[in-house]
Regions:
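Short, flexible/disordered intra-domain loops and linkers
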Residues: 58-66, 121, 154-162, 194-204, ...
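Histidine-acidic metal/acid-base catalytic patches
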Residues: 1-10, 42, 75, 90-107, ...
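N-terminal start-of-chain detector that recognizes signal peptides
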Residues: 3, 20-23, 81, 117, ...
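Active-site acidic/histidine proton-transfer and metal-coordination neighborhood
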Residues: 66-182
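N-terminal pre-domain/capping segments
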Residues: 1-90, 94
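Conserved beta-strand positions in the central sheet of alpha/beta enzyme cores
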Residues: 27-34, 48, 110, 145, ...
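Short, flexible, glycine/charge-rich loop motifs used to bind or transfer phosphoryl groups or to couple energy/partner
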Residues: 37, 172-174, 211-213
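Active-site beta-loop-alpha junctions enriched in small/polar residues
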Residues: 14-19, 33-35, 50-56, 114-116, ...
Length: 251
């Protein structure tokens, strides 16, 4: 059994959606939503910007987003197509700087991968450089990280970085191209991408995925661990419940 105190002592804790940690632990960083339908943020302390993640449709109806035609145009049935072009990458950086204006500089900016029906890893790297140059010109010390993704209402492709082998391919490029980019490893999304059923958990398959990524542990700057539970209709609800509901009470 993992010693909870010793486990949590290894991390800088991030507050998600005003949820609290066990007694004796306080989050040092606040996660702030920064998707394309946001036109204002309200950080209360050091914060991590959780930028557009392309799960579902956006309205694109704020005064702020109206300034960025490339961001609006890069949409399929309302779902944002991240990293669609060089112009998109440039406007994405400007959007973030605009959103931050009047507030303290973020500690972390968390980005997300494109879909694979219009962008390759090489294309992402080229567009990320444009974004990174503008962001670090504005905020030299900000940490930029990318999260592995799985799950979206998008049709036509899937996220470019979701499975363990795709995370490794990205890490290889980060190193070979000397990108100023870290990785946030989202464990539940990794399970989804690898088709690991939490109610019929296959330890060997999970360990294989983790061992594949382990060689790049130096690039892993953070992790996401969260619960799930099933709704009344039997649909999984993310960021809800706990590990008991997620794994069916199995050890």
């Amino acid at each position: 059994m993992v010693n909870q105190k010793r486990f949590l002592d290894n991390f800088i804790l991030v507050e998600y959606n005003n949820l609290s940690y066990p007694e004796g632990y306080t989050a040092q960083i606040q996660e702030v939503a920064a998707h394309f339908d946001k036109d204002v943020i309200d950080p209360q302390r050091a914060y991590s910007m959780h930028t557009e993640y392309s799960y579902g449709k956006r309205k694109y109806n704020t005064e702020l987003i109206s300034k960025y035609p490339a961001l609006i145009a890069a949409s399929k049935n309302g779902v944002p197509q991240l990293w669609k072009s060089a112009e998109w990458a440039s406007e994405f950086a400007d959007f973030i700087v605009d959103l931050v204006s009047g507030h303290s500089v973020p500690t972390i900016i968390e980005i997300h991968p494109p879909f694979n029906d219009y962008c390759s890893l090489a294309g992402f790297v080229d567009r990320f450089r444009i974004f990174e140059n503008k962001i670090h010109e504005a905020y030299p010390d900000v940490i930029i990280v990318i999260e592995n993704r799985a799950g979206s209402v998008y049709h036509g492709g899937r996220f470019l970085v979701g499975k363990a082998k795709e995370i490794v391919a990205l890490c290889d490029l980060i190193k070979s191209e000397a990108l100023n980019l870290g990785v946030v490893l989202d464990f539940p999304q990794l399970l989804t991408a690898e088709n690991i059923d939490p109610l019929k958990f296959k330890t060997e398959k999970y360990q294989s995925a983790i061992q594949t990524i382990a060689e790049h542990r130096d690039l892993i700057k953070g992790i996401h661990i969260w619960g799930k539970k099933k709704s009344a209709t039997g649909r999984w609800v993310a960021h809800a419940g706990n590990f008991d509901t997620y794994f069916g009470g199995n050890d």
